[in-house]
Design a protein with these regions (language model features):
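Positively charged, solvent-exposed patches that mediate nucleic-acid binding
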Residues: 1-115
Length: 115
Protein backbone atom coordinates (compact mmCIF):
# COMPACT_ATOMS: atom_id res chain seq x y z
CA UNK A 1 0.00 0.00 0.00
CA UNK A 2 1.24 3.43 -0.87
CA UNK A 3 2.48 5.62 1.99
CA UNK A 4 0.15 8.49 1.05
CA UNK A 5 -2.83 6.13 1.04
CA UNK A 6 -2.43 5.22 4.71
CA UNK A 7 -3.99 7.08 7.63
CA UNK A 8 -1.35 7.75 10.25
CA UNK A 9 -2.33 10.87 12.19
CA UNK A 10 -4.28 10.59 15.42
CA UNK A 11 -6.49 13.47 14.27
CA UNK A 12 -7.54 11.51 11.17
CA UNK A 13 -8.53 8.52 13.29
CA UNK A 14 -10.41 10.67 15.81
CA UNK A 15 -12.29 12.49 13.05
CA UNK A 16 -13.47 9.15 11.66
CA UNK A 17 -14.48 7.84 15.08
CA UNK A 18 -16.52 10.94 15.87
CA UNK A 19 -18.00 11.91 12.49
CA UNK A 20 -17.79 8.78 10.35
CA UNK A 21 -20.32 6.06 9.71
CA UNK A 22 -19.62 2.65 11.24
CA UNK A 23 -20.51 -0.99 10.76
CA UNK A 24 -19.93 -3.54 13.51
CA UNK A 25 -19.57 -7.31 13.35
CA UNK A 26 -17.88 -9.91 15.59
CA UNK A 27 -14.55 -9.63 13.76
CA UNK A 28 -14.11 -5.90 13.31
CA UNK A 29 -15.57 -2.41 13.36
CA UNK A 30 -15.26 -0.45 10.11
CA UNK A 31 -15.50 3.35 10.12
CA UNK A 32 -15.70 5.40 6.93
CA UNK A 33 -16.04 8.97 5.79
CA UNK A 34 -15.69 10.68 2.43
CA UNK A 35 -12.39 12.42 1.71
CA UNK A 36 -11.41 15.02 -0.86
CA UNK A 37 -8.89 12.85 -2.67
CA UNK A 38 -9.77 10.54 -5.50
CA UNK A 39 -8.53 7.45 -3.69
CA UNK A 40 -9.15 5.53 -0.51
CA UNK A 41 -6.98 6.05 2.56
CA UNK A 42 -6.85 3.20 5.03
CA UNK A 43 -5.94 2.88 8.71
CA UNK A 44 -5.83 -0.09 11.06
CA UNK A 45 -6.24 -0.28 14.81
CA UNK A 46 -5.15 -3.46 16.56
CA UNK A 47 -5.23 -3.07 20.33
CA UNK A 48 -2.67 -4.55 22.70
CA UNK A 49 -5.62 -6.35 24.31
CA UNK A 50 -5.57 -8.75 21.35
CA UNK A 51 -2.12 -10.09 22.18
CA UNK A 52 1.58 -9.51 21.81
CA UNK A 53 3.37 -7.88 18.89
CA UNK A 54 3.51 -11.08 16.83
CA UNK A 55 -0.24 -11.63 17.13
CA UNK A 56 -1.08 -7.98 16.41
CA UNK A 57 1.17 -7.89 13.35
CA UNK A 58 -0.39 -11.10 12.02
CA UNK A 59 -3.87 -9.59 12.38
CA UNK A 60 -2.69 -6.37 10.71
CA UNK A 61 -1.16 -8.30 7.79
CA UNK A 62 -4.36 -10.27 7.30
CA UNK A 63 -6.48 -7.10 7.31
CA UNK A 64 -4.12 -5.42 4.83
CA UNK A 65 -4.31 -8.40 2.49
CA UNK A 66 -8.11 -8.57 2.73
CA UNK A 67 -8.31 -4.90 1.76
CA UNK A 68 -5.77 -5.31 -1.06
CA UNK A 69 -7.80 -8.11 -2.64
CA UNK A 70 -11.15 -6.36 -2.14
CA UNK A 71 -10.00 -2.90 -3.27
CA UNK A 72 -11.15 -3.30 -6.92
CA UNK A 73 -14.70 -3.91 -5.63
CA UNK A 74 -14.74 -0.74 -3.48
CA UNK A 75 -15.63 2.81 -4.41
CA UNK A 76 -12.82 5.37 -4.28
CA UNK A 77 -12.60 8.62 -2.32
CA UNK A 78 -13.10 7.35 1.24
CA UNK A 79 -11.16 7.29 4.49
CA UNK A 80 -11.56 3.86 6.09
CA UNK A 81 -10.46 2.68 9.54
CA UNK A 82 -10.65 -0.99 10.49
CA UNK A 83 -10.61 -1.78 14.22
CA UNK A 84 -9.82 -5.44 14.87
CA UNK A 85 -11.78 -7.29 17.54
CA UNK A 86 -10.82 -10.38 19.55
CA UNK A 87 -12.32 -12.84 17.04
CA UNK A 88 -9.73 -11.70 14.47
CA UNK A 89 -6.97 -13.37 16.46
CA UNK A 90 -8.16 -16.94 15.95
CA UNK A 91 -10.74 -16.38 13.24
CA UNK A 92 -10.56 -17.97 9.83
CA UNK A 93 -9.33 -15.81 6.98
CA UNK A 94 -12.45 -16.47 4.88
CA UNK A 95 -14.75 -15.36 7.69
CA UNK A 96 -12.69 -12.21 8.24
CA UNK A 97 -12.88 -11.47 4.52
CA UNK A 98 -16.64 -12.04 4.43
CA UNK A 99 -17.20 -9.84 7.49
CA UNK A 100 -15.08 -7.02 6.01
CA UNK A 101 -17.00 -7.15 2.75
CA UNK A 102 -20.39 -7.24 4.49
CA UNK A 103 -19.38 -4.22 6.60
CA UNK A 104 -18.36 -2.38 3.43
CA UNK A 105 -21.69 -3.25 1.83
CA UNK A 106 -23.57 -1.97 4.89
CA UNK A 107 -21.65 1.31 4.64
CA UNK A 108 -22.26 1.63 0.89
CA UNK A 109 -18.56 1.35 0.02
CA UNK A 110 -18.96 -1.34 -2.62
CA UNK A 111 -19.40 -0.49 -6.28
CA UNK A 112 -22.52 -2.65 -6.52
CA UNK A 113 -24.08 -0.75 -3.60
CA UNK A 114 -23.49 2.51 -5.47
CA UNK A 115 -25.36 1.36 -8.58
Amino acid sequence: MNERRTLKKNSDFRRLYSRGKSAVNPYMVVYCRRNRTGENRLGYTVSTKLGGAVVRNRVRRRLREIYRLREPELRQGWDIVVVARMKCVKGEYKKMDASFFSACQALGLTKEAAE
